[in-house]
């Protein structure tokens, strides 16, 4: 990994480990699928990723005390997961996912409330509801990890902390 990116990633951990890390839909989906059934990584909706990508993601996210998300990301992640899995696998996955998404516990994902008035109209037009909501949440100083270059650029251009997972993959020699 390039030393400047590695230094930046370490700095982000130092500054955001207690507060947590905000994940976009594709990153959250990759993380959850890799934890539940790693052999699905590389399949539908996760075609561009391999197990080493999932390992890189998991290793980095472990540095943070909690995973932050929004209700929009949870809805998209749930819908995408339904496209990936069927039958008993899907039922087992959603039974496992329910407490993470819906029950307030130490292990559950932390939802960041986004008010409609906080979403920038221009970003909404360019990025849609889910990503403009993530951008609004990141403006509060939350560290965002995304695979979406447009979202990464939008957040970083506002001076908010953002990591592009593709850059991490490139630096780790996975692309």
Each language-model region and where it sits:
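Short alpha-helical "patches" and their helix-cap loops
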Residues: 43-48, 89-101, 146-155
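Acidic active-site catalytic centers that drive phospho-/nucleotidyl reactions
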Residues: 24, 131, 148
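Short, well-structured N-terminal submotif of metal-dependent ribonuclease cores
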Residues: 1-69, 84-89, 170-174
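Acidic, PIN/NYN-like endoribonuclease modules and their adjacent C-terminal/linker elements
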Residues: 1-18, 36, 119-123, 127, ...
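Alpha-helix capping/helix-boundary segments
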Residues: 27-28, 73, 134, 150-152
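A short acidic (Asp/Glu
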Residues: 31-35, 78-82, 154-158
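PIN-domain endoribonuclease scaffold, especially VapC-family toxins
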Residues: 52-127, 132-133, 173-174
């Amino acid at each position: 990994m390039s030393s400047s990116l590695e230094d930046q990633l370490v700095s982000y951990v130092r500054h955001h480990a207690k507060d947590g890390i905000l994940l976009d839909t594709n990153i959250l989906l990759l993380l959850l699928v890799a934890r539940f059934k790693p052999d699905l990584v590389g399949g539908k909706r996760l075609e561009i990723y391999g197990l080493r990508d999932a390992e890189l993601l998991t290793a980095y996210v472990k540095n943070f005390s909690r995973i932050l998300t929004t209700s929009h990301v949870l809805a998209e992640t749930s819908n995408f997961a339904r496209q990936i899995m069927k039958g008993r696998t899907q039922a087992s996955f959603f039974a496992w996912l329910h407490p993470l998404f819906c029950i307030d516990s130490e292990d559950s994902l932390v939802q960041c409330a986004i008010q409609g008035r906080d979403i920038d109209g221009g970003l909404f037009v360019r990025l849609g509801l889910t990503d403009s909501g993530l951008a609004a949440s990141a403006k509060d100083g939350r560290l965002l990890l995304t695979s979406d270059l447009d979202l990464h650029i939008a957040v970083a251009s506002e001076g908010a902390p953002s990591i592009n997972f593709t850059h991490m993959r490139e630096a780790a020699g996975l692309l």
